[in-house]
Amino acid sequence: MGLRYDGNGYNLDATYFHNRLTDMIVSSTPCPDGVNRSCAYNVNEATLEGFSLAGSTRLMDVNLRASLDWQDPRDDTTGRQLARRAKKHANFAADYVMGQLKSGAELTVSGDRFDNAPNTNRLAGYGLLNLYTTYQFTPDWSLLLRVNNVADKNYEVARNYGTSGRTWFASLRYGIR
């Protein structure tokens, strides 16, 4: 169920969700049988319940966007939090437009989560900052420069899973209009 407001240069969305799932396939380390490796397994009954807020606006030449999510990802059989699912997550973005140049920043923040079904291995929350610049030099051609994880943050979405450090991208894009 959701509500939406569009007006006066503002877009706001509020959504409540309640999903009951049967035979949900999830991943965990170690496996429920105790073997110390990551494996997929079945959760008989699960509930994903929560609330999402999102909004966007433009202030002069700056576009602003934000989203916040709160959820209770629950294994209904055990009553525990589902593995590798944070209860809180947020995204914030701003970009500045000046003619054919657009530059921006994105911040992603994720709360802590458990790496395993018994909820004994907690993974820390994290925040990542990304920066980008796009130059549209013709209607069809643009150049993109991007840096993800600017602070070179070490973080885990799964125990001992190698996530990217600081990453640089450059791309030339052609789009048929």
Language model features by range: what are they?
Residues G2, A46-A54, K87-H89, Y126-Y132, ...:
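Transmembrane beta-barrel architecture of outer-membrane proteins
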Residues R4-D6:
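Short beta-strand-to-turn element immediately C-terminal to the catalytic PLP-Schiff-base lysine
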Residues Y10-T22, P30-P32, R37-N116, Q136, ...:
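Gram-negative outer-membrane beta-barrel transporters
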Residues R20-T22, M60, V109-N116, Y126, ...:
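C-terminal beta-signal and adjacent terminal beta-strands/loops
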Residues V43-E45, L82, N121, G125, ...:
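Residue-level "hotspot" positions that anchor or transmit function at local structural transition points
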